[in-house]
């Protein structure tokens, strides 16, 4: 057997063992190979994967699992280092059970279709569980109308209180349609039995601006770039997840 042929067989066997058994000790230091060995190794890799395509899928799945684990670990560190601003900022609306043993925080944008889809399911989760404290973080990222809607919602909380905010928040998801302008939002609030003009007058206050700015800064620290994003325990859940998935995550956090 020639040296290249022997090297190819040797590398193929080692590659198979390494990929299927995950044994680091069997892996090669490719940088120490001679040119013929390196070329033979490349051919061995290609040949092995062509003959065993399922192995490649296993490798990809393992890499994705490792990346997910690393992401989760990194997210946990981010949440723990920002816990006070996430769970006890003193200005975000708090619903559900104020004394609940688990707090679920949601970053939202009223123009986000997945936030709208998640809204009714989150409410069902909170209501049926009975032991969840639910916090909403206004995080407008989809343009000027998103900012206007969040300004109005925060102003409703500051001017008219938590019940008014809850009406606006729920109404913007379930009833309001069309352009989100201050005038139309004020009229909508009036239809809900609120003082729409007074709320609109508070939209541009420094206090409202500070809430939105603080939420933006918090989202940056948490590396949140989209909505909805949920935080519970030391975990971040990025994106929409159906109700049963949310329940599973709640159970996992509770242990």
Regions found by a protein language model. Give the residues of each.
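A short beta-strand-turn-helix
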Residues: 84-102, 126, 216
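The canonical Cys-X-X-Cys-His
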Residues: 112-116, 229-231
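Bacterial N-terminal signal peptides that target proteins for export
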Residues: 2-13
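Structural alpha/beta surface segment adjacent to cysteine/selenocysteine redox centers
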Residues: 105, 116-190, 195, 220-225
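C-terminal cap of thioredoxin/glutaredoxin-like
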Residues: 28-48, 187-255
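N-terminal targeting signals for export/organelle localization
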Residues: 2-4, 18-82
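Extracytoplasmic/secreted envelope proteins and their assembly/folding machinery
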Residues: 38, 42, 46, 53, ...
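Second-shell loop/turn segments in exported
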Residues: 29-34, 43-49, 107-111, 138-142, ...
């Amino acid at each position: 057997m020639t040296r290249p042929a022997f090297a190819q067989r040797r590398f193929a066997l080692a590659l198979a063992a390494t990929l299927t058994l995950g044994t680091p000790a069997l892996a090669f230091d490719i940088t120490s190979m001679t040119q013929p060995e390196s070329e033979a190794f490349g051919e061995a890799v290609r040949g092995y994967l062509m003959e065993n395509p399922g192995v490649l899928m296993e490798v990809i799945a393992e890499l994705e699992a490792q990346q997910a684990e690393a992401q989760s670990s990194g997210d946990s560190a981010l949440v723990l280092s920002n816990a006070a601003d996430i769970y006890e900022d003193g200005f975000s609306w708090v619903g559900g059970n104020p004394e609940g043993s688990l707090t679920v925080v949601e970053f939202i944008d009223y123009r986000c279709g997945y936030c709208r889809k998640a809204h009714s399911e989150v409410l069902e989760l909170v209501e049926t569980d009975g032991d969840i404290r639910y916090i909403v973080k206004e995080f407008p990222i989809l343009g000027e109308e998103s900012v206007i809607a969040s300004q109005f919602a925060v102003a409703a909380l500051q001017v008219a209180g938590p019940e008014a905010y809850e009406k606006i928040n729920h109404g913007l998801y379930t009833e309001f349609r069309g352009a989100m302008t201050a005038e139309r939002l004020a009229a909508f609030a009036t239809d809900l039995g609120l003082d729409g003009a007074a709320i609109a007058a508070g939209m541009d206050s420094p206090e409202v601006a500070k809430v939105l700015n603080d939420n933006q800064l918090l989202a940056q620290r948490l590396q949140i770039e989209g909505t909805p994003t949920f935080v519970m325990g030391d975990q971040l859940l990025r994106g929409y997840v159906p109700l049963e998935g949310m329940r599973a995550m709640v159970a996992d956090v509770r242990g």
